[in-house]
Amino acid sequence: MNIFVTGTNTDIGKTYVTKYLYKALRTRGYRVCIFKPFQTEEIGGGRYPDLEIYKNECDLDYDVTSLYTFKDPVSPHLAFKIERHQQLNHQTMIDKLESLKAQFDMILIEGAGGIAVPIYEYSDHFYMTTDLIKDTSDFIVSVLPSKLGAINDAIVHQKYIDHQELPPNVLIMNNYTDSAIEQDNLHTIEKLIHKSVYTLGHQATQESFSEAFIQRIIGGSNG
């Protein structure tokens, strides 16, 4: 099963959620890996922030987690333009995933930035994150902010997913502290989009996910 982890924006906590989801699924006996096909922003010595987290905290090497890496902290489509020696090879990406599927029960695919990020610009169209999801994934984990603005972000995000006819998704509000505004954000989002929203606190562990959230992912259901 391929699970795509995306969010309403960049720096929303996708890596944080992915890391603990990986650990939570592992403790339940699943063979799990993480794959981030497009990683920007080198931090020196051929190292990249998210890939370093997966290496140091999940014991997953770069040869498992990465495919395309770029020096500058920019959108993948611009990174490809800057580093012109790199070209998107769709078949290489699919082959990498097929190789991982032969070894693991579940693959957590972390996207770059939010749901509408362009990945590669061809002469007549863009290859978008939504195309990547359609090509690779069975289910989506949508990471939401808990702060002011979360309601608008969540509604736009969900409407876009529905409009693009993407696979089923589950929503999780990151860095949730149970403050009055966060409680209202959670309640209002659920009423407006007619879906359950799960939460993950700032000081999380693999035990922090509710069993209902894990079962939703394992079952791959919408709602």
Curated annotation (Swiss-Prot):
Molecular function GO labels: ATP binding; dethiobiotin synthase activity; magnesium ion binding
Catalytic activity, reaction form: (7R,8S)-7,8-diammoniononanoate + CO2 + ATP = (4R,5S)-dethiobiotin + ADP + phosphate + 3 H(+)
Highest taxon, organism lineage: Bacteria
Binding site for ATP: D11, I12, G13, K14, T15, Y16, D50, E110, G111, A112, G113, N174, N175
EC number(s) per entry: 6.3.3.3
Main subcellular location of this protein, as a coarse class: cytoplasm
Gene Ontology CC annotations of this record: cytosol
Binding site for Mg(2+): T15, D50, E110
Residues annotated to bind substrate: T40
Subcellular location: Cytoplasm
Pathway given in the UniProt record: Cofactor biosynthesis; biotin biosynthesis; biotin from 7,8-diaminononanoate: step 1/2
Catalytic center residues: K36
Alphabetical list of InterPro entries matching this protein: DTB_synth_BioD, P-loop_NTPase
SUPFAM superfamilies: P-loop containing nucleoside triphosphate hydrolases (SSF52540)
Cofactor requirements of the protein: Mg(2+)
Keywords: ATP-binding, Biotin biosynthesis, Cytoplasm, Ligase, Magnesium, Metal-binding, Nucleotide-binding
GO biological process, one term: biotin biosynthetic process
Quaternary context: Homodimer.
HAMAP family: BioD (MF_00336)
UniProt function note: Catalyzes a mechanistically unusual reaction, the ATP-dependent insertion of CO2 between the N7 and N8 nitrogen atoms of 7,8-diaminopelargonic acid (DAPA, also called 7,8-diammoniononanoate) to form a ureido ring.
Family: Belongs to the dethiobiotin synthetase family.
Listed name of the protein: ATP-dependent dethiobiotin synthetase BioD
